[in-house]
A protein has these predicted regions:
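Short, contiguous acidic/charged loop-to-helix segments that flank catalytic cores in large enzymes
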Residues: 70-74, 78, 138-142, 181-189, ...
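C-terminal, charged and often intrinsically disordered regions of DNA end-processing helicases
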Residues: 1-93, 306, 317-318, 326, ...
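A non-catalytic, helix-rich entry segment at domain boundaries
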Residues: 85-179
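Metal-dependent nuclease catalytic regions and adjoining charged, substrate-binding loops involved
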Residues: 125, 233-238, 243-332
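Non-catalytic protein-protein interaction segments used by genome-maintenance enzymes to assemble
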Residues: 169-251
Length: 332
């Protein structure tokens, strides 16, 4: 199948690549603002634009698909899927339960974690709910052991020790129509995404929890750096969790605390899942601390996205391109 992507792949390596926004492209972007369209803009897609407008164009406008290879072993995305599915099975037990520490400790003692991890592997990777560990390869047994260790030694003991919360939602859709101004007047982008977990904290605020399997990134150089900093300062996990907190705040009228659960680090006694703002010196800031400037930057970014005079340009930071599905087109 031949796909027209609007890019001359014969350009010299030094030529910057950009795609101008013609009428057809503006119509496709209109899906995210049209109330009649089911299309929504996820926090992941929004960050994709912040990091590299051209990558956003390839993925969300031209809708190019990266080649899906059949993985012989569990890759990083599948590892994350298994972990998320196992957590959801376990935490479904405590939805609505205030101060669930004792229940979590009992689940650890009763050996429920390994069973939930096995069920997650069977359903998501083997796609055979009746499978047993006898069907697991060496790699799959290792994945089972690692996920079990992360949950039994990190996530669940952490929550049991800091249980001033009530889980109110798991894998729950959060959405908000964010208003901003374009040349044609005021419109609204339909943001929507699936929050891993939403907690009600004892002090009356909410917490949006995002489970992460990668290396911890909780420090950032102020909210402005997430949008305009050098490549490595634009931290996707922090920007995205702030977007989820914004959607909760705007739809429920309650402040929200962004929390990143980096599962590989949660066995450390000093682990904190809250954001560490090096610009203000604040650790654990709630959304309203950032709301005014954050929403201003979101509005400016959306105004640029919907400005027909601003083409989709490739990012300047080549490090961003290392793991991009489309770097062959850009020759980076």
């Amino acid at each position: 199948r031949k796909v027209e992507v609007g890019v001359d792949v014969n350009l010299a390596e030094t030529d910057p690549i950009e795609v101008r926004k013609d009428e057809g492209i503006m119509q496709r972007l209109g899906r995210f603002t049209d109330p009649e369209s089911k299309a929504t803009l996820s926090p992941t897609a929004f960050f994709r634009y912040v990091a590299c407008p051209l990558r956003f164009y390839f993925h969300s406008v031209a809708r190019l698909q990266a080649d899906d290879e059949i993985a012989e072993e569990v890759d990083a995305p599948m590892f994350g899927t298994i972990l998320h599915a196992a957590v959801q099975k376990l935490y479904a037990r405590i939805v609505g339960e205030a101060h669930p520490g004792e229940t979590l400790r009992a689940m650890i003692r009763m050996g429920e974690i390994a069973a939930s991890v096995e069920a997650a592997i069977n359903e998501n990777y083997l796609q055979d709910p009746a499978a047993t560990t006898d069907d697991y390869t060496g790699n799959l047994l290792l994945v089972k052991d690692i996920v079990t260790r992360y949950l039994r030694g990190g996530v669940m003991p952490y929550d049991a020790a800091h249980d001033a919360f009530t889980v109110t939602g798991l894998e729950q859709e959060v959405a908000y129509a964010f208003p901003f101004r374009t040349q044609g007047g005021v419109t609204a982008v339909k943001f929507a995404g699936i929050a891993d977990r939403i907690d009600a904290l004892d002090d009356g605020t909410l917490r949006v929890v995002d489970y992460k399997t990668g290396a911890p990134h909780l420090e950032f150089a102020g909210v402005e750096s997430l949008f305009r900093g050098e490549g490595k300062q634009r931290l996707s996990n922090i920007l995205q969790t702030l977007l989820y907190a914004m959607m909760l705040y705007r739809t429920r009228g309650v402040d929200a605390e962004p929390a990143l659960y980096y599962v590989r680090a949660m066995n450390r006694p000093d682990y904190l899942p809250t954001l560490d703002d090096r610009e203000t010196g604040v650790r654990g800031g709630r959304y309203t601390l950032y709301a005014e400037r954050f929403e201003e930057l979101v509005r400016e970014t959306l105004a640029e996205l919907y400005d027909p005079a601003v083409p989709f340009r490739q990012c300047e930071d080549a490090d961003t391109c290392k793991f991009c599905d489309f770097n062959v087109i850009c020759k980076r």
